[in-house]
């Protein structure tokens, strides 16, 4: 997995599945963010369900939206 500069990676738990591969994720610091699946996860048909533990990448510009980059087994 390539590391990007300037992004914040944080763990969270998926609380709700929304349309168009969007998810509501509660982060470990109790914030709620709206996240979508990264392209590689979509390409490899990795399914995400509520209650899954995931890693979310946040941009420093908008901390309310993110990208799910990893799902724990």
Curated annotation (Swiss-Prot):
<dbReference type="GO" id="GO:0043022">
    <property type="term" value="F:ribosome binding"/>
</dbReference>
<dbReference type="InterPro" id="IPR012340">
    <property type="entry name" value="NA-bd_OB-fold"/>
</dbReference>
<comment type="function">
    <text>One of the essential components for the initiation of protein synthesis. Stabilizes the binding of IF-2 and IF-3 on the 30S subunit to which N-formylmethionyl-tRNA(fMet) subsequently binds. Helps modulate mRNA selection, yielding the 30S pre-initiation complex (PIC). Upon addition of the 50S ribosomal subunit IF-1, IF-2 and IF-3 are released leaving the mature 70S translation initiation complex.</text>
</comment>
<dbReference type="InterPro" id="IPR004368">
    <property type="entry name" value="TIF_IF1"/>
</dbReference>
<dbReference type="InterPro" id="IPR006196">
    <property type="entry name" value="RNA-binding_domain_S1_IF1"/>
</dbReference>
<dbReference type="Pfam" id="PF01176">
    <property type="entry name" value="eIF-1a"/>
</dbReference>
<keyword id="KW-0699">rRNA-binding</keyword>
<dbReference type="GO" id="GO:0003743">
    <property type="term" value="F:translation initiation factor activity"/>
</dbReference>
<keyword id="KW-0694">RNA-binding</keyword>
<dbReference type="GO" id="GO:0005829">
    <property type="term" value="C:cytosol"/>
</dbReference>
<keyword id="KW-0963">Cytoplasm</keyword>
<protein>
    <recommendedName>
        <fullName>Translation initiation factor IF-1</fullName>
    </recommendedName>
</protein>
<keyword id="KW-0396">Initiation factor</keyword>
<feature type="domain" description="S1-like">
    <location>
        <begin position="1"/>
        <end position="73"/>
    </location>
</feature>
<keyword id="KW-0648">Protein biosynthesis</keyword>
<comment type="subunit">
    <text>Component of the 30S ribosomal translation pre-initiation complex which assembles on the 30S ribosome in the order IF-2 and IF-3, IF-1 and N-formylmethionyl-tRNA(fMet); mRNA recruitment can occur at any time during PIC assembly.</text>
</comment>
<comment type="similarity">
    <text>Belongs to the IF-1 family.</text>
</comment>
<dbReference type="GO" id="GO:0019843">
    <property type="term" value="F:rRNA binding"/>
</dbReference>
């Amino acid at each position: 997995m390539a590391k990007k500069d300037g992004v914040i990676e944080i763990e969270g738990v998926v609380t709700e599945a929304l349309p168009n591969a969007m998810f509501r994720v509660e982060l470990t610091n109790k914030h709620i963010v709206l996240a979508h699946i990264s392209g590689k996860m979509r390409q490899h048909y990795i399914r995400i369900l509520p209650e899954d533990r995931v890693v979310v990448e946040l941009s420093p510009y908008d901390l309310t939206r993110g990208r799910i980059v990893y799902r724990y087994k």
